Amino acid sequence: MLITRFAPSPTGDLHIGGVRTALFSWLVAKQKGGEFRLRIEDTDLERSTEASTQVILKGMEWLGLDYQGEVIYQSRRTDIYNAVIDDMIAQGLAYYCWCTPEELEEMRAAQKARGEKPRYNGKYRNGGEPVDGVTPVVRFKNPLEGTVSWHDHVRGVVTIDNSELDDFIIRRSDGMPTYNFCVVIDDHAQDIGLVIRGDDHVSNTPRQINLYRALGYQVPEFAHVPMILGDDGKRLSKRHGATNVLDYQKEGYLPEAIINYLVRLGWAYGDQEIFSIEELLTHFSIDDVHSAPSTFNTEKLRWLNQQYLMHTDIKELARLLPDFCAAQGYQLTQEQLLTVVPHYQERAKTLREMAEMMRWVACAPETFPEAAAKKAFKNDTAQIMQLLITKLQALQDFDEKTVHDALAAVVSELNIGFGKMGQPARLAITGGLPSPDLALCFALIGKENALQRLQYAIKFMTQNQ
């Protein structure tokens, strides 16, 4: 059974690049009938936070990237790592190094001066006397000769000379094992068969493979996916709008749209743009992921999210929207939402935008956009609105049909085009926000609100003409 994993560090927000890595790992495990595991790599105790861990867990839940088994926390496994390190020292696979930071800096400076690659020179590789006042680190005895080679599912065959690698630290002087060591122990313990991660880890892979071999562990397969770039060709960062994945939730993106967009960053299946999870499980292949960086395009994501909004069940949107309405300072009943949502599914690109567009249903305009008011409010508009008020006041039943008849009566009685009455009436009711059929707009807000808004518009016109 194939087991994959996602192993983020809780030292900051869970960003788009990490989510894509998790998605690829999740898809491959699902395709193979295997398992997908989650591991929190929190060995950096100073920078790791519980808040970041919660963002990871909540982000995975929101996206539907379910994992099997318990979450593994590296910070709780220190005794396990140190026991292995102690055994390695006893077997001659690792050794203590008493070099001070000053010594190491002098070593690097001398190597640079000679035009050499800065690296640890193996001073304590074959033993040495302890140095008073210095707490040693532990280094792995990397092979001095030969090569490390692996077939990468994305990059193809990668070969590194061992002469390019130094004896890297596997336990710091504070007693905490390092990332490159812990990841090997944990991937072995969790039976990880395929490691999918960002290509910024390529330089770690030969070191880790040598550790696997030294410990007699089965070496997993690797797939190093390329980085994601912003529109300017630079690595995606906050300046491009790259945010915590939960910020996309707050902005009103649907998880299905995020999944769909991310899988297409570096992978394609013909010209198809929109994929269901079932289609991804059928067509996706980690071997078809491109090795070149992908460009993140926010407008493309917004377009894709709009496609999902258009095809999402109205009841589901009505279930999701109250939080976004509340963020805008208003609430609508489920009945109102079910009525008005269909008119915005093709207009809005996010749930937040949809909530902004629908705000007029609950909130009367406090003012009117200057350009719209100049276009709609003419010298005779107040008279037209007053007649409309009279017609609406006379209605016993206030629904879409009766309002439609009242609107038609005003147009007929004054012998004017519908737009001459409809345009200012719509502005008075909605404040210029996108809106459905005018009669429905009136029916949605009710008779009392409709009359108040028309009267407010007349007052506005009187004061500004």
From Swiss-Prot:
Q: Where is this motif: 'HIGH' region?
A: 8-18
Instruction: Supply the name of the protein.
Output: Glutamate--tRNA ligase
| Organism the protein comes from | Dichelobacter nodosus (strain VCS1703A)
Top-level class of the enzyme under EC nomenclature: ligase
Q: Name one GO biological process term.
A: glutamyl-tRNA aminoacylation
HAMAP family in the cross-refs: Glu_tRNA_synth_type1
Its recorded reaction(s) are: tRNA(Glu) + L-glutamate + ATP = L-glutamyl-tRNA(Glu) + AMP + diphosphate
Q: Does the keyword Zinc apply?
A: no
Any Gene Ontology CC annotation: cytosol
Q: Does the keyword Methyltransferase apply?
A: no
To which protein family does this belong?
Answer: Belongs to the class-I aminoacyl-tRNA synthetase family. Glutamate--tRNA ligase type 1 subfamily.
Q: Name one GO molecular function term.
A: ATP binding
Q: Which UniProt keywords apply?
A: Aminoacyl-tRNA synthetase, ATP-binding, Cytoplasm, Ligase, Nucleotide-binding, Protein biosynthesis
Q: What does this protein do?
A: Catalyzes the attachment of glutamate to tRNA(Glu) in a two-step reaction: glutamate is first activated by ATP to form Glu-AMP and then transferred to the acceptor end of tRNA(Glu).
